[in-house]
Regions:
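Bacterial Sec-pathway N-terminal export signals of envelope proteins
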Residues: 1-47, 76, 192-233, 281, ...
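Periplasmic alpha-helical coiled-coil/stalk elements that build and connect Gram-negative outer-membrane
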Residues: 5, 103-217, 319-322, 326, ...
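Small/polar (Gly/Ser/Thr/Ala-rich) solvent-exposed segments
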Residues: 22, 45-65, 73-102, 226, ...
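Amphipathic alpha-helical coiled-coil segments
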Residues: 23-38, 103, 107-130, 137, ...
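Outer-membrane beta-barrel architecture
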Residues: 36, 71-73, 238-241, 276-278
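Membrane-embedded beta-strand positions in outer-membrane beta-barrel channels/transporters
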Residues: 69-71, 115, 274-276, 320
Length: 404
């Protein structure tokens, strides 16, 4: 049986089957676990311990001993370290969510491009096959004219060469199709032998946004830039944590203990409460080194954000310009196909009537094949560049409505 697959179905299948998507989703769970840890470090913690012993002192008999203790501790002041760690962990959760969303976008783009690659290769096989058929028919006509004595042997040989070359293009085109199909199957994690029937095809959807609109939209919505800004905030928190090394820490501790019985009573108990203050007065420059390192990391994060903005700006502009170029190409090549078809028909009829030459047929056929291939390439180039532009912008919606 043959699996029918629309473009939306292909994207959904990739989202379900691609382990890269699962990995980013698991990253969200890891970030949430880290947040729970950070919050726990700023809360009360309980510990309990119990020891049981048995000893014989100078053969006076065995004595049993039992010591029990319960204690609780609570950080009162950490110079803001615990609070900063909680904020940083909350940012980790947001970053993990954005990474998952970006993985969805890049996976969707890869599937869309692979889907259109298959369709393009399939369409071009039709062009190559039509060229082979035309050269095959032309060879038959030349052989008949040669048998009648109206054409030279050299024209038969030239026709055979052109037919052979056309078959080479057909073979290469089929190989491109099979390779593109394998790439699509790989993205969808399908069996490499399962036949596929792609049910969607290119549909021209105008894109009305200007290049400036697209760049602005990308700089506001691109997930990587949002991630960079969150990581920049984390580096700022890390600087505060490093400077907290100059400050004291205060902890509250409570405890209870007893021995020789399971539970304490009025005659057998020990209660304690304490507030501990710790202040690292001199550490031979360790804290200063941590502050310098944190400030350097902050500068790196700032530079990374600026670099990514520049890279995204360039990528958006390239894909936008390439999309517009492809749009102009397929609008112009549609007329070229009709002209090439008419030119080929005229050249063929003139040749049959003995008024044309072999070169006219070859040139007309090559022009027709090229025009058809250019039209196909332009269509799917437009679709691929439009998808790439939308992915570059960080979403599937263009910044301006389509003018009807």
């Amino acid at each position: 049986s043959c699996m029918s697959l629309s473009l939306d179905e292909a994207v959904d299948m990739a989202m379900k089957n691609n382990p890269d998507v699962l990995i980013t989703q698991l990253g969200e769970e890891k970030a949430k676990a880290g947040l729970r840890q950070a919050r726990g470090q700023n809360s009360i913690s309980w510990t309990a311990g119990s020891t049981f012993g048995r000893s014989d002192n100078n053969n006076l008999g065995w004595n049993n001993s039992n010591n029990n203790k319960i204690s609780a501790s609570l950080p009162i002041y950490s110079g803001g370290v615990h609070q900063n760690n909680i904020k940083s962990s909350e940012l980790d959760v947001d970053i993990a969510k954005l990474q998952t969303e970006r993985k969805w976008e890049t996976t969707q783009l890869a599937v869309i491009q692979a889907y259109y690659d298959v369709l393009e290769a399939q369409k071009k096989i039709g062009v190559y096959q039509d060229t082979v058929n035309k050269y095959q028919q032309h060879l038959i006509n030349v052989e008949q004219l040669y048998s009648a004595g109206s054409k030279a042997k050299v024209e038969v040989l030239r026709s055979e060469v052109e037919l052979s070359n056309a078959r080479q293009d057909l073979i290469k085109g089929k190989n491109t199709y099979y390779n593109n199909l394998s790439t699509l199957r790989n993205l969808l994690y399908l069996d490499s032998q399962e036949p596929l029937e792609l049910t969607d095809d290119f549909v021209y959807i105008p894109f009305a946004g200007s290049i400036g609109d697209c760049v602005d939209f990308a700089l506001a919505n691109r997930k990587e830039l949002l991630i960079d800004s969150y990581q920049l905030q984390q580096k700022e928190l890390a600087v505060k944590n490093a400077k907290a090394g100059y400050l004291p820490t205060v902890d509250l501790s409570l405890g209870a203990g007893w021995n020789k019985q399971v539970l304490p009573d009025g005659d057998n108990h020990e209660y304690s409460a304490s507030i501990g203050v710790s202040w690292n007065i001199f550490d031979s420059g360790v804290t200063a080194g941590k502050v310098d390192a944190a400030n350097t990391e902050l500068k790196i994060a700032q530079a990374t954000l600026q670099k990514d903005k520049n890279d995204i700006d360039l990528s958006v502009r390239k894909n936008y310009n390439s999309m517009r170029e492809a749009e102009e190409r397929f609008n112009s090549t549609e007329t070229a196909i009709k002209q090439a078809e008419e030119d080929y028909f005229i050249a063929q009829e003139k040749y049959k009537a003995g008024e044309g030459i072999m070169l006219d047929i070859i040139d007309a056929q090559e022009a027709l094949s090229t025009a058809r291939q250019n039209y196909i390439s332009a269509q799917y180039d437009y679709a691929r560049y439009k998808a790439a532009l939308e992915a570059d912008m960080g979403g599937t919606n263009e910044p301006a409505p389509i003018d009807n």
